[in-house]
Amino acid sequence: RERHFIANQYSLEKYAVLESNLLERFADQRVRLVVDSLSTLLIPFGQEEVLEFHRNRLKSLRKKGILALDVFVDGVLDRRVMTIIGHFYNVNVRMKFGGPKARPERLIQVGKVKSGKFDAVPRRFGISPIFGIIFAPDVEV
């Protein structure tokens, strides 16, 4: 079970309060906020509400100097909404699994929506609890 979670996902205000309270505890530190997954939280809401909430949330986090990594599961939210949301971020990271089903590999592509440039070829990667994302060939994936 996750340490921080929302039992009732039908309230963006509850999420905002939880996130704000959590971040206040680290106000004097550099913070990297990882939310997995925002797409499931946003399912019950309409397009305008999702976009307004997300735009305001990211603006507030940037003002506080907080680096956000938000995970969105592909295919959960409307494609148009995801395209617009993608423009709210400086960098987008696409993660997926590839290779044989018997031994799948984690793959990553990094890009900027505004320039339309993504890595042409996905790279293998691993995730370390100490160092974060480690690109192959530096790690066994």
List the predicted regions and their residue ranges.
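Phosphate-binding/switch region of NTP-binding enzymes
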Residues: 66-67, 71-132, 140-141
